[in-house]
Amino acid sequence: MYYREFGIPARIGKCKDVEEIEKFVEQYNGKKNCYASVYVFDDEKLKAEGRTNYETALLNTVWFDFDDNKDVKKCLMDVRRFIRRFCKPLKITPRIYLTGGKGFQMNIDFHSPVDLPAHVKRQAIREYLKHLKVKYSLKTLDDICINNSVSCMRRIPNTEYISKITGEGTGVWCTQFSVEEILKMGIEELYAMAQEEN
């Protein structure tokens, strides 16, 4: 059976279904930042002490994390550039989220999982993301997330961003936006919607 990890951001649970994730979100949302693993993993192939075997990741998406601690507009510009130069020409519709903090998350989903040998999954995702970062000049594409690839944790949509400085909720929620909204709206409008939506 497959499971997804839950974190705050430290990994504290293995969720076998949406209901288990929702229980964690109900417990921690508004108190801690809520994260889930990008990929699901096979619980029949755990490592020693029940640790996750990241080589069992089911590769059904490619995940992008755009971050800039000083200017989130740079992230928006990178996301727009990638949509215009990569997604639109290939007729790809990504899922895009304003994280509520200083960046965006994007997923490009596959029609079916990519079947790669277990020992090359991490390297394949990492090298592909590095290639895209260079080719499309994605300066805000997070190198730490690229290097972690299959073991990355992503902010859970519809959860409140908690300030790392104050430990308090900011009133800004991780919110999904359409490609059209991302291409047309300014950063202030996007943040305003991320506050209103929830």
Regions found by a protein language model. Give the residues of each.
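Catalytic micro-motifs at enzyme active sites that drive phosphoryl/nucleotidyl and oxygen chemistry
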Residues: K47-Y54, I83-R84, L90-T99, L141-C145
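Histidine-centered divalent-metal-coordination microenvironment in nucleic-acid enzymes
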Residues: T61-F64, C87, K91-P117, M153-T159
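DNA replication initiation on ssDNA origins
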Residues: M1-T61, F66-V79, N148-M153, P157-E196
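A generic structural signal for short coil/turn motifs at secondary-structure boundaries
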Residues: D71-K74, V114-A118
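Long, well-ordered alpha-helical scaffolding segments within enzyme catalytic domains
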Residues: K74-I92, V120-S137
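Aromatic- and Lys/Arg-enriched surface recognition patch
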Residues: V120-K164
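Short, charged, solvent-exposed linker or helix-capping segments at domain edges/interfaces
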Residues: A118-H119, E168
